Amino acid sequence: RLDYLDLYLIHWPLPKRDNYIEAWQALIEAKKRGLVRSIGVSNFEKAHLDKIIKATGVVPAVNQNEIHPYWPQKDLVAINQKYNILTEAWSPLGRGNQAELSEATINILAEKYNKNNGQIIIKWLLQRGILPVVKSASPQNQRANLNVFDFQLTSDDMKQLDQLGRADGRVDNQDPKTY
């Protein structure tokens, strides 16, 4: 039995249903009652954030979004930073997209730093101020995912990784405006 949750997120804004403000108000109430320590959102874009903040005056602690080298979401990360919202990346390794994971730029950096490609991507996110949520069933990969604090990517490295973004980089085309 739990007395409280550390963090509770609204998973999608679902704009077609247009009830995410009511859902946000319910999370605010749960936080006031001590059932939740922090509240946040997932897959919210600027318009969604603006709408809930304007309606309630409460800024989410976290906005969890799809972010990886093919879909870097620079504008959304900047909006989250403006509101002092922690950006959390889901599918930071592009759901294991082998084309993305084996990009030449990532391969070169992995060799340069004696790291694996996933570690390069995780470090790129961390240096952008983004918290990656990496999942793995393999204890070996779990340990590797944590072994990213003994090196720093240079600003040139970061720029090279930033340039991997694509207009069609989303995984499964899950657009928060229509999903």
Predicted features and spans:
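Beta/alpha (TIM)-barrel catalytic core signal, keyed to glycine-rich beta->alpha loops juxtaposed to Asp/Glu
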Residues: 12-179
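Phosphate/pyrophosphate-binding loops at sites that engage ATP/ADP/AMP, CoA/4′-phosphopantetheine
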Residues: 1-3
